[in-house]
Amino acid sequence: MRFTVAIDGPAAAGKGTISRAVAAHFRFAHLDTGLLYRAVGAKVTEGADPVAAAEGLDLADLARGDLRSAEAGQAASRVAALPEVRAALVAFQRSFARREGGAVLDGRDIGTVICPEAEVKLFVTASDEERARRRWLELAAKGGAQSEAEILADLRERDRRDREREAAPLRPAPDALLLDTTELTIDAAVNKAIEAIELRQAQGRE
């Protein structure tokens, strides 16, 4: 059985948490596509050519411990603006999406570019301030020293870059369900996503 769930949205909106929970609930495979770009960005920061880094990416590269840092996020946004890098990673993502047993992919262009035929498309968002608060709490728990104001500025700069890039800009697919998590608990947001998927599965059985 092939069933693809595409979950897009800006940084720290909750799409990763929702994606992991949804994948576990339905026993689908999960791919955080942002890690692909973070891994490429990390290699570029170390001196690698962006396209060569993307073409030579291995699953083992996604296990690096520094991929969740703010620096890796900014590097990811820069390399994601390169059409050649995005093209090099498309086949990897599409192959994962159509695997047997179902798949959940989260990123910024899954529903619009990678899997426009996905059975379910969600676009997860939240206010800038709430996203900055969440990211600050996440980083502070790991000993991060960035202030909430600095994180807010970084998020807004990354949003601007992601929305204005020519290659696969950040935007919801026309048929995506918009899920604003600003006022939602994690459980409430996950439940809304599960309900949307279960509804689509029921429609497919009719």
Swiss-Prot record:
InterPro entries: Cytidylate_kin, Cytidylate_kinase_dom, P-loop_NTPase. Keywords: ATP-binding, Cytoplasm, Kinase, Nucleotide-binding, Transferase. It comes from Cereibacter sphaeroides (strain ATCC 17023 / DSM 158 / JCM 6121 / CCUG 31486 / LMG 2827 / NBRC 12203 / NCIMB 8253 / ATH 2.4.1.) (Rhodobacter sphaeroides). ATP binds at G9, P10, A11, A12, A13, G14, K15, G16, T17. It catalyses: CMP + ATP = CDP + ADP; dCMP + ATP = dCDP + ADP. Disulfide bonds: none annotated. Its main location: cytoplasm. Pfam families: Cytidylate_kin. GO terms for biological process: pyrimidine nucleotide metabolic process. GO terms for cellular component: cytoplasm. It is found in: Cytoplasm. Gene3D superfamilies: P-loop containing nucleotide triphosphate hydrolases. The keyword Transferase applies. This is Cytidylate kinase. Its EC number is 2.7.4.25. The keyword Cytoplasm applies. GO terms for molecular function: ATP binding; CMP kinase activity; dCMP kinase activity. Belongs to the cytidylate kinase family. Type 1 subfamily.
